[in-house]
Every structure is written in C-alpha cells, then in structure tokens.
Regions:
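Outer membrane beta-barrel transmembrane domains
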Residues: 151-157, 161-201, 205
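Transmembrane beta-strands of outer-membrane beta-barrel pores
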Residues: 4, 13-17, 65-69, 100-106, ...
C-alpha cells in the first residue's frame, strides 16, 4: 500500500471495496459477516489493485480491478472484476456509500455479474445505525439469476464495556429461482469487552426461510474474539 496526501494505492492480495465500508460500519464481523459477504454477493479479498482519492472532507471515490475469483483462485483468463465507489459525508457521523461492480465471465454462454449497492448510516460515540440495499444480476454468471436484499442494523454502547446490537436481513431471488436459500434473518445480542484484547458476544438468531412448508429456525451462539 502507498499513500500521499489525498491519494491511496493498494496492490497485491488486497481487501476488496465492494462491502468493506459496510463491514466496518457494522463492526461485528466476528459475530456475523456483512450482508454481501454473508450471502456471497462478492469476495472480501482478491488479487489486484485499488485506488482511492479524497476530493474533499465530504466526498471521496475509489476504483478497483481484481482477479474476480476471490483470494482462493488466482486467474485472469476468465475475466476481471471492476468496481467504482463513492462515499459521501454530508454531516459529521452521517455517511452514504454507493457502489457498482462488473465481474466478467470470460466463458461462452456465461453472463457478467453486476453488483449494485447503496448504504447509509450514522455513527455516534453512544450508538450506530445503518441500512443497505444490494442487487446482484446474473449470480454465478447465470442469466436472470438475480438476487437482492437489504440489511438494517443498530448498536448501543453501554457503560463498563458492554454493547447491545440488533440486525435484520432480508434476501430475495428473482422469480424465486433460489427460493430454497431465500430467507429473512434476525440477530440480537450483547458484547462484553474483557480487557483490551478479548470480546465475548452471546446472541440469539432466527432464520425465516421463504420456501413453503419450511419452518423458522432458532439458535443461540456465543462468539469470541481474541486479537492484538
């Protein structure tokens, strides 16, 4: 990576920009990935280059070109993945993120994947709220295999290193082509910071499948984070 003034460049195996902003805003990846990562709208890392430029305090833009197959498969013959993003900060704490990406197929009969995303959120020292909408056309390079959905989340910081969080996801597929995996999900929980490097987060989850006759699923987790 390299930075100079308002310009930043990254190359090699890098974090992609498709949903990195949303993931950071959500802030609980070790508990549950952000919407696009959770439902495989894209990869969190890939081989390529990215550039970002801050035009003013309230607006910045970024572009990325990567291998398109994620960090587990390195190739160029099957097409590349291109992305453009704009981040707006109209007022302190309130941010808007717009992103569009095109992932080439490189194979006859396969369609390019198009990703469109819009996010807005407000972050305060006491609380965070955010909402995003995502649309993916031609999932897995299959024509008309479109998916879309939204995610809404909020968290509140309490005294003594305790925070509460909640999130609702809703995933759809065009003409119900992927109805077996379409679902709405709710997660509620708390996070306890035990010192500087340890976090423990008990949480309750409810998954509500959209396929007829499939019952909702209820589960409880305790997620742990250890980091330096």
């Amino acid at each position: 990576s390299w930075e100079s003034g308002r310009l930043a460049l990254n190359g090699g195996l890098i974090s992609t920009t498709q949903f990195k902003f949303q993931e950071k805003f959500w802030g609980y990846r070790y508990i549950m990935k952000s919407f696009q990562d959770e439902y495989k709208f894209g990869s969190s890392a890939d081989l390529g280059i990215s550039v970002a430029y801050k035009f003013a305090d309230w607006i910045s833009a970024d572009a990325i070109i990567v291998n398109g197959e994620g960090y587990k498969k390195i190739q160029i013959k099957d097409g590349l993945n291109y992305g453009l993003g704009v981040t707006l900060t109209p007022v302190k704490g309130f941010q808007i993120r717009l992103y569009g990406g095109l992932n080439e197929s490189g194979k006859k009969g396969k369609k390019a994947i198009t990703n469109l995303a819009a996010f807005m959120g407000y972050k305060h020292e006491k609380f965070t709220i955010g909402a995003e909408y995502n649309y993916m056309m031609n999932a897995s390079h299959q024509e008309n295999a479109d998916q879309n959905g939204y995610s809404v989340f909020a968290s509140v910081n309490l005294p003594k290193n305790v925070s509460l969080y909640a999130r609702f996801d809703d995933l759809y597929s065009k003409n119900d082509w992927n109805i077996a995996k379409d679902e709405a999900t709710v997660i509620l929980g708390a996070q306890f910071k035990l010192g500087k490097y340890v976090k423990i987060a008990p949480n309750f989850r409810m998954a509500m499948p959209k396929a007829d006759g499939v019952k909702s699923k209820y589960s409880a987790y305790v997620n742990c984070y250890f980091g330096i």
